[in-house]
Amino acid sequence: YYFDQHRSMQQNLAHVLKTGGPFAAVHSHVYFYSGVVVTIARAHGIPVRIAHAHNTSFGQVYTLKRRAYEWLMRKLIWRNATQLLGCSTDACEFVFGPGCMDDPRCRVLYNGFDVDHFRFDADGRAAVRKQYGLEESFVVGHVGRFEEQKNHRQLIEQFAAICARRPDAMLLCVGRGSLMDEIRAKSETLGISDRVIFAGAQKDTPAYYSAMDVFLFPSLYEGLGSVLIEAQANGLTVITTQTVVPRDVDVTGRAAFVPLEAPAETWAEAVLSAPARETDGRSAETVKALYDIQSVAQTLCAIYCREMGGCT
């Protein structure tokens, strides 16, 4: 089905539910707007109505209008959803409100992925390090869009502090976005442009994870931070932001949390004191126990079946 651009979101959804059914379930991933989605779904007799939370902030300014909107959407979600899901406890509480986990309708459903795909690969490590001349370097890695949320401005300052203590340090950034040129210019201003690699978007991210020695991710907010889980599956220690990144992300015991407001030198110390990366696959097995895509898919199917009163 497609949505007619001349209709509103509400009109399009109502039209699809009315003319395209019957539907057994509506599973909404549009944050607070899920309040509208599950309300329309209930009005059209959809028996299973799921609201799913994926973040802990949007970086928005909290005006009175915004607070009123979120209050109303929460009311609609609680009144009309049959199940509340989130990628972390923090994400659930951000969208559904504090104390939501006490309700039997609310639970965490991890973002499953093919964990085996992200295992450490010695050949991939050698190839990427050779491609960029990193054979003898201490490689600090980062994977993320060059947008405000990922906080590259502080990342580059933190790496400058690392450079002051590790002459062999190199920063390997995977991703692209609207702030890339600004961050590239900032690296030149800090005098470290020759020690920063902007690799752009890459399809073979496991090889890039394998090329890294530690993972630095000072994000401003995250529902979970999937790249942090991928990096741990690859055997990396991850250094990320205290409070705004959920503690759920520490799957392997290889996550260190630093306050966002801490000076760059504090972040540098966390990176430089991080345990050496693993290469034997133990971390991948630990991650797989929670995030294996097949297991997560089976859990979601079980939720659908339970909500529908059983599957045939």
Regions found by a protein language model. Name each.
Residues S28-S34, A53:
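Short His-centered aromatic/hydrophobic patch
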Residues R79-R119:
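A short, active-site helix/loop in glycosyltransferases that binds the activated sugar's phosphate group
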Residues F138, H142-A161, S178-R184:
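A conserved mid-protein helix/loop that constitutes part of the nucleotide-sugar donor-binding site
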Residues A201, L220:
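Aromatic "clamp/platform" in nucleotide-sugar-dependent glycosyltransferases that forms part
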Residues L228, T237-T241, R247:
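Short hydrophobic beta-strand element within catalytic cores of glycosyltransferases
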Residues E278-T312:
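A charged, aromatic-enriched C-terminal amphipathic alpha-helix characteristic of glycosyltransferases
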